Amino acid sequence: MYPFIPPARLLPGSPAPFLPSGPSCPQPSGPYPGPAVRVPGPTRSYVSTNVPFPELPRPNSAPTDPVGPLGTQGSMSSGPWAPGMGGQHPNVPYLFPESSPTPPLPVSGAPPVAWVTVPPGAWEPPAQYPTPEASYPSPGLQPSPNNPYPLPPGPSAASPGPGSLHRMNEIPGGSPSDSSNPESTLESTGQKKHLKLDNKSIKRRRSKKKSKRVTWGDIKTLTHKAESLGKQQGHNTTDPKMMLLCLMTMLHVNSQHESEGSK
């Protein structure tokens, strides 16, 4: 397998070449197998497995050369094969004796136009859509069929402007009441306006008078009056509880006098 190289001739006086006693490479150890022993004999070349297979029978008498024509379905050749090698390509379709049907036309019936073609004539932008005709009526005030409070025609239907005098107690569909009489009622419309509660007239609250500032002199005077009142009734004024009772009585009497004087 490798060419044989003869050893170099030794010159006289030159040292002898170093020759190892054992093999040049150590023997492998482990699970790996040792080197194969070469058997003496003639060496043969390696035979490749890429050889042509024998021709197989094709159905419908189809040609075996993939380079040749395969009918209306085109050629399925995969390379420059020589005739007679056998077209065993897996993608070669089987041929049928009848011809393939014609593909149907589009639904519209017009022939297909390639996308690269341009129709003859100068190109112009598309025309604008026509403006719709004014067939709808103009919006306006339409009377409501289910209006429970129709406005009567005339100047009275207009709403009062700002600053104008108008009656606030008018009710739609009824007669306006007399605003001069506060106790008048709307008998015609079935509605009544009560201005009295529990048959008692409403009174205005009187403004409270500012209370007088209490001084120590007022406290001494009130205490002296309470002590005199307790002595007149025979109570012991030295008792704090009794003195407090007399003082509360004196305050109650003074409040009664003030209320009677204000009336």
Swiss-Prot record:
Biased composition (Polar residues): 176-189
Keyword Phosphoprotein attached: yes
Top-rank taxon, per record: Eukaryota
Ranges of compositional bias, category Low complexity: 156-165
Any one GO molecular function term: identical protein binding
Biological-process GO terms, alphabetical: meiotic cell cycle
Biased amino acid composition, Basic residues: 202-213
Processing after translation: Phosphorylated in vitro by MAPK1.
A GO cellular component annotation in the UniProt record: cytoplasm
Subcellular location: Cytoplasm; Cytoplasm, Cytoskeleton, Spindle
Subunit structure: Interacts with MAPK1.
Protein name, per record: MAPK-interacting and spindle-stabilizing protein
Source organism of the structure: Mus musculus (Mouse)
Organism taxonomic ancestry: Eukaryota, Metazoa, Chordata, Craniata, Vertebrata
